[in-house]
């Protein structure tokens, strides 16, 4: 009887944990996919290259696509998140600079409903890059 009770409690706890994670996932998706975002800060190899992203706006969709529009340029990429690891991955396949600089797995360092700060270790140059996105 005790084993059955313990097994039931473990199952209940795991179910609740999955439910909470799903709710967190849904909340994140609602914030990210609602509105347009822009690069408010980007530091690469200790150099501020934020101005390279001037004029670009990003639209994240629930189907994990992201569209970057700047001037006459529109590029579609993919994005994904991992709530447990606090990471977001972006991939603009075949994109040129500056969008190619976003093709990383970013660790979220700070987040609000209208801004996100993140960092990543550049796997090519072995440096830490910093990104700040703000909602328009």
Listing of model-derived features with the role each one plays in the protein:
Residues 2-7:
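Sec-dependent signal peptide recognition
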Residues 9-10, 127:
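N-terminal leader/targeting segments
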Residues 17-78, 83-136:
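Lipid interaction determinants
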